[in-house]
Each structure stands twice: as structure tokens, then as C-alpha cells.
Regions:
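Conserved SF1/SF2 helicase motif Ia
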Residues: 272, 276-279, 284-315, 394, ...
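Conserved helix/coil segment N-terminal to the catalytic DExD/H
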Residues: 294, 332-367, 378-385
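Conserved Helicase C-terminal RecA-like lobe
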Residues: 286-289, 293-302, 360, 468-495, ...
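Conserved helicase motor
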Residues: 308, 327-335, 349-355, 375-381, ...
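Charged, low-complexity
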Residues: 2-4, 11-14, 24, 35, ...
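Short Cys/His-based metal-binding microdomains
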Residues: 94-148
Length: 623
């Protein structure tokens, strides 16, 4: 075997052999002439990553794709182990990533890689395992590590992430016999049954009595701990919390569906709350965090959200929980310091999180709340990759639209919640999409099966579903007459609209010029209903401002109510602001020209300043 120095940087060539390997002697005798003949090279078959070849199983096709990827990736380098028992290392020189591989030869059932693809695909291989076989021709594994010879409890990812016993070491037969009394079958797999995690813990202790070197992998311990925590949380809900007993959890009254969402998040631990906008996903996320803290399952929470929502999250956390929340901001060193603060809540933006991950900051949290998680719907973006690198025991993802266009977006979002929820990816795509001969997606199928798989992870309610649980909303439409000048402009454009619509009805066609004229006339009719000032900024004929001021005067004189006014037209709000100035009524004005950094300050002042009674906003304030 080559020493480590000789192995480092041994790249995978596209021919499938390690570069720099010594060739064999030709066997030619001295002085003998021999014609050098080129041996024909067998071209490797190329596989389409979108279309499974006829006569080939889905799994075999995926294994072939991983072998093909290993052959084509010139940035992979294989490092052989220094001694028997140590893993191989496969380094991506370009991405500066490293994966550990236990390699025992081509197609060995004992091969294991630390990468996510190996753990989720169920194929028993990955690009890194194939790279070792190509780069070294498998010679290291076949000669020195034919089969493992140890007793250990590990995760079999090929059989669906099941706990399995390997009993190939000294006293292995004794350990195997012992395992049959603790819920294992003849093949070494743990049988699914109630309370099995407790029996596994007891088995590990007795197995170590037989073999002090008995190994339990970290992944196995993680699963055992997760099973124990799941059972503990479920028991807490059954023993201590009814639907009404959550009322004192937050400094706010909760609707029944919100209590249901909090209990769902607490019980399942890693969830996506996908309620429609306006149903209070934020308060449910905070409620899950508070319940987990109260029962001792978490100590700290990290909220990752869009930049514009950082201060809103801070206000809501402090308002509903009464606890401190620190916003992660400043330069890299300042942000790194804030991550280490001993506070219950920390809040960072998606962009800051990306820079901190790339900068090497070790971001840790017991619970991570991802707000507006649909922003991570594109799997291959840097922000999505950085978010997937964050580790936590609990996750609450919030989104009103977890699926917008493509079904792959849902898979990307669910990887943040639980990377095994919909895995493996290739099977998910094969089961849910219809493709044409070119591999283009032309339809979807089996969507009901996705809903079944997501049941332990996703809860979604629509407004119509919970309407009876919510207080009635009072909608009141006030009709305001237009002035003579407004009516003249409105009628003129109304005539143009009527003429063009009649033309379309006769010919079923409008030219591009007529279409633009139609849209322009409709817009003018809408604008002039507010004020002629919105059109020309010279004249001002309107009645709506006076009526609005009358309503504002009536509301603020009878209590401490505050008023929010939306308008599509900034010019209309400018007139409104002039009237408020004249009456000396405090207000804040949010429009598209206000920098994002200053918007939280405007909202904060409106909410907290008793002298600020009115908030004016264009469409910019609705996001």
C-alpha cells in the first residue's frame, strides 16, 4: 500500500483509474523489436440523469449515475487510511469538503459513507464510495479489509435507516444470542415495537459486559435519544396539557387551532406549520418554543427570517413570552459574539446566516425556527445549503406557501425539517412526476401519498377551516361621491373603455395599441376616484380625504385606537399626510422609497409611541 503522502491528491481520472499509477512491465526482452499496438478502450456508457433506460431498474440506474458522477468529477481526491480500521477520506478540492468512507470492496454491504446521499438514497453506495473503487481499483479494500471484524450497533441505511447489530468480532455469537432476547431478529435488525429504545439501552450495557470493545455508532445513539425524547414529549402532553391548559403559556389568548398547532409542534419536534397568511404562524412558533423550554427540552432558540422581519420577531417574542431576544447583527466578529450570548432567543436574517456559515461560525441552537421558509425552495442556492448545514434537535418551519410552482420545492423545504421525510429524492421524483420522452415534467401523480408521508411533519389550516373559531370581522364599505371635475375625467375614460370592450366583442381581437389604451383608461378611472391630484399633481378635486379625516377624528377622540391606511397611490397618501400635519395628528409614512433598514423603526414607533396614531402605507408595507 502507498503511504499517505503518496495517496493525498490522487484524483479520479475520467478513465476510471487513479492518475499517477505505475504501469506494468511490457515484458519486452532486450534488443527485441515489438510493434506497439493500441488497445481499443471501451467507452463507458453515458446515462441520462432524467430518464431511466428501458430494462434497467430505478435503483441500478441511480447507482450507475453515481459511478458516472465519480468518473467525471476531476475535483475528487482519495486519501487511503494510514492503518487498518481507519476510514478512507474523499476530498472535494474545489468545494473544500471531506467525507469519511468505510470501504470493504466493490458492492460490499458493509461500505459506509458520511455523506447525506448515502444515508438517504438506500442504494448502498454514493459518488464517494464509487470514487474509491475507481481511483484505487479497489485494491486496498480487497487486500486488507475484506470484511469488518467487530461487534457494533450501527444504522443500516440501505434498509431504511434501521438499527442493526453486527456481531463479527470476538464473542460475536454470544452477543447475537443475547440480542434475540432484546427485540432483534436473526438478521440483527431491531424489531419495531413499543418501548424498544429502553430495551436497546439495556442490551448495549449487557453487550459491553461480554465485549468491552462493543461499539455503538453516534448515529445509533442519536436515534435512540430521539425515540426517548419523542416518548417523553408525548407523555407530557397526555399527563399535563389539555387543549385549554395552554392558555397561560403566552401573554395572549390563543384560538383553539393555534393551541392545536403548538401541541402538534411540541409532540412531533420537527414540523412545518403551513397555515394560510393571517392565522398566526408566528405566535404558534413562539408557543412551541415556550412549551419546549417550560418542559426542559430546549434552552435556546434561533429564529432565521428575512431581514425585514427581524425586529418584528423581536417585538413579538418579547411581547408574547416576556423574554429577551437578541438580534444577530454587526460585523462577522460581533455576530459571532452574539451567537454565544446566554439568551433564550437569538434572531438572524437568512443573509447573515449565510455569511456566518461561510465564515466558519459554529451556529448552535436547541430549536431553530425558519420563518418564510419558502425562500429556501431552490435546493441548490447558497442560502439553502447553508441552512441545511445548521444542526438542532428541534425545527419549526413556517410558511403560508410551502409549494408554489414545482413539487421539488416541497422536497427542498422538507429537507430542513427532516432530511428523511420524503427521501430518497430520486424515488420521490419518480413516484410523483410524469415525464415525456425528453425528460421534461408534464404532470404530477400520487400526491395523496405525499400527504400521507407528511402527516407527522406538516399541519396546515385555511381560514375557511377555522372561521368558526375566530371572532367575526366587520367589513364596512363607505361610498364617497366624486366631485364634478372627477366625474368628467371618469366618464371620458369610461366611454373609451366601453368602446374598446365593444370592439373586442365584435372582432374578438384588440391590437397592442388598443390593449394598452384599455389598461391605461381603467387605471385613470381608478386613480381619479381618489383625487385628480393623483393624475396631474397640479389640481386637487376630491372628497375622500375629508371623509377619511372625519373617520380618523372620530376614532382617536374616543379612545387610544390607532389607524392603518393603505393606498396603492403614494400621491394620495401624500395628500393624506398634509391633512394629518394640518390637524397635528402624529403619523408614520411607509412607502417604496423608505430604505429597508429604516422600516422597522417606523413600525416600532407606530406601535409603541402613544402620540403616533396613524400609519400610512403603500403596497410596500404589506410584505
Amino acid at each position: 500500500m502507498k503511504n499517505k503522502a503518496a495517496e493525498v491528491g490522487e484524483k479520479v481520472g475520467k478513465t476510471g483509474k487513479a492518475t499517477g499509477a505505475k504501469g506494468k512491465s511490457s515484458g519486452k526482452k532486450k534488443g527485441e523489436k515489438r510493434t506497439k499496438q493500441k488497445q481499443p478502450r471501451r467507452a463507458a456508457q453515458k446515462y441520462n440523469p432524467y430518464i431511466c433506460p428501458d430494462g434497467m431498474s430505478l435503483e441500478d440506474w441511480q447507482r450507475a449515475l453515481r459511478c458516472q458522477a465519480a468518473m467525471r468529477d476531476d475535483h475528487l481526491a482519495v486519501q487511503a487510511p494510514d492503518k487498518a480500521g481507519d476510514p478512507f477520506k474523499v476530498v472535494n478540492i474545489k468545494k473544500q469538503t471531506e467525507h469519511l468512507v468505510e470501504y470493504y470492496g466493490p458492492k460490499s454491504e458493509y461500505n459506509v459513507c458520511s455523506c447525506l446521499d448515502f444515508k438517504t438514497s438506500g442504494l448502498g453506495t454514493c459518488k464517494h464510495i464509487e470514487a474509491i473503487g475507481i481511483a484505487a481499483d479497489g485494491r486496498y479494500a480487497r487486500k486488507r479489509y475484506a470484511k469488518p471484524s467487530e461487534n457494533k450497533l450501527y444504522i443500516d441505511y440501505v434498509e431504511g435507516r434501521r438499527i442493526r447489530l453486527m456481531s463479527r468480532g470476538e464473542n460475536g455469537e454470544s452477543i447475537k444470542r443475547l440480542s434475540l432476547d432484546y427485540g432483534f431478529d436473526e438478521e440483527g435488525y431491531v424489531l419495531e415495537r413499543e418501548g424498544i429504545h429502553e430495551k436497546i439501552v439495556e442490551f448495549i450495557a449487557k453487550a459491553r459486559d461480554i465485549d468491552p470493545g462493543f461499539v455503538t455508532t453516534d448515529e445509533t445513539l442519536d436515534i435512540i435519544i430521539t425515540l426517548r425524547q419523542n416518548k417523553a414529549r408525548k407523555k407530557v402532553l397526555e399527563d399535563k396539557y389539555t387543549s385549554s391548559s395552554l392558555d397561560g403559556l403566552l401573554k395572549a389568548s390563543l384560538y383553539p387551532y393555534q393551541r392545536e398547532g403548538i401541541k402538534f409542534g411540541f409532540e412531533h419536534g420537527r414540523v412545518l406549520i403551513a397555515d394560510e397568511m393571517g392565522l398566526g404562524k408566528t405566535i404558534q412558533g413562539i408557543g412551541v418554543a415556550e412549551l419546549l423550554m417550560r418542559e426542559g427540552f430546549v434552552n435556546n432558540v434561533l429564529v432565521v427570517c428575512p431581514t425585514s422581519l427581524k425586529y418584528q420577531w423581536k417585538r413579538e417574542i418579547e411581547r408574547f413570552s416576556g423574554k429577551d431576544a437578541e438580534i444577530v447583527e454587526g460585523n462577522l466578529m460581533q455576530r459571532r459574539k452574539i451567537y454565544g450570548f446566554d439568551v433564550p432567543y437569538r434572531i438572524c436574517s437568512y443573509n447573515s446566516m449565510l455569511h456566518d456559515v461561510k465564515g466558519g461560525t459554529d451556529i448552535k441552537a436547541d430549536l431553530i425556527i425558519y420563518d418564510e421558509v419558502q425562500r429556501l425552495k431552490n435546493w441548490d442556492t447558497q442560502i439553502a445549503k447553508a441552512a441545511r448545514s445548521l444542526k438542532s434537535d428541534y425545527v419549526v418551519a413556517l410558511s403560508g406557501t410551502p409549494l408554489e410552482n414545482k413539487i421539488t420545492e416541497l422536497y427542498s423545504v422538507m429537507e430542513l425539517v427532516d432530511q428523511y421525510a420524503l427521501a430518497p429524492y430520486y424515488k420521490f421524483i419518480a413516484d410523483t412526476t410524469e415525464r415525456d420522452a425528453t425528460g421534461r415534467v408534464v404532470g404530477y401523480r400520487n400526491l395523496n401519498h405525499i400527504a400521507e408521508r407528511l402527516a407527522p411533519y406538516l399541519i396546515r389550516r385555511r381560514k375557511k377551516d377555522v372561521a368558526l373559531q375566530m371572532p367575526p370581522r366587520t367589513d364596512k364599505t363607505l361610498f364617497v361621491p366624486m366631485t364634478k371635475e372627477q366625474m368628467e375625467i371618469h366618464s371620458e375614460n369610461q366611454f373609451t373603455v366601453a368602446r374598446l370592450i365593444e370592439k373586442w366583442r365584435r372582432t374578438m381581437f384588440l391590437s397592442e395599441k388598443d390593449r394598452k389604451k384599455l389598461l391605461m383608461s381603467l387605471s385613470i378611472m381608478r386613480m381619479v376616484c381618489d383625487s385628480t391630484f393623483v393624475l396631474d399633481q397640479r389640481s386637487r378635486h376630491d372628497t375622500k380625504i375629508a371623509e377619511t379625516m372625519h373617520i380618523i377624528d372620530e376614532m382617536i377622540s374616543n379612545g387610544d385606537e390607532k389607524v392603518v391606511i393603505f393606498s396603492q397611490w403614494e400621491r394620495m397618501l401624500r395628500i393624506m399626510a398634509q391633512s394629518l400635519d394640518k390637524e397635528k395628528i402624529g403619523y408614520r409614512f411607509l412607502h417604496g422609497g423608505v430604505p429597508s433598514a429604516k422600516r422597522p423603526e417606523l413600525i416600532e414607533d407606530f406601535l409603541e409611541n402613544p402620540q403616533c396614531r396613524v400609519f400610512l402605507s403603500t403596497d410596500a408595507g404589506s410584505t
